[in-house]
């Protein structure tokens, strides 16, 4: 696939998440997706991707991710992202604060046969927890 086609797969992936249409994830994610950096306690694969997203939406019902930049080479696409939402639900055991939060992240997606087969992500969890008042910064 071309670099532009791979970028489009990543864009569709974010659109599916942002619209909370998890039943459409199979359009862009491999069933046996490798997610080495997923949150502790979350299963690997597409099921883990769904669980992680549902956890975010439970704590931040208006949660959205904006792609700030895409860089691609070969079969990999790097996305620099900003995630934001209002904390009106319990998140990882933290009671709702009502605060709007925004934090950044970056991930690398490897594409094969038109689907994301590997996903490595890093998010600024310190900023997220600081904005929720859990960490003193």
Enumerate the language-model features and the residues they cover:
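C-terminal and inter-domain tail/linker signature
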Residues: 1-137
């Amino acid at each position: 696939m071309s670099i532009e086609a791979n970028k489009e797969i990543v864009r569709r992936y974010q659109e599916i998440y942002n619209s909370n249409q998890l039943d459409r994830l199979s359009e862009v994610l491999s069933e046996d997706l490798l997610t080495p950096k997923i949150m502790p306690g979350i299963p690997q694969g597409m099921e883990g991707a769904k669980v992680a997203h549902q956890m975010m939406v439970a704590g931040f019902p208006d949660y959205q991710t904006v792609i700030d930049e895409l860089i691609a080479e070969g079969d990999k696409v790097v996305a620099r992202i900003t995630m934001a939402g209002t904390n009106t639900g319990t998140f990882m055991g933290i009671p709702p604060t009502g605060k709007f939060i925004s934090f950044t992240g970056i991930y690398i997606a490897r594409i094969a046969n038109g689907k994301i087969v590997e996903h490595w992500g890093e998010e600024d969890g310190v900023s997220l927890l600081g904005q929720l008042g859990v960490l003193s910064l």
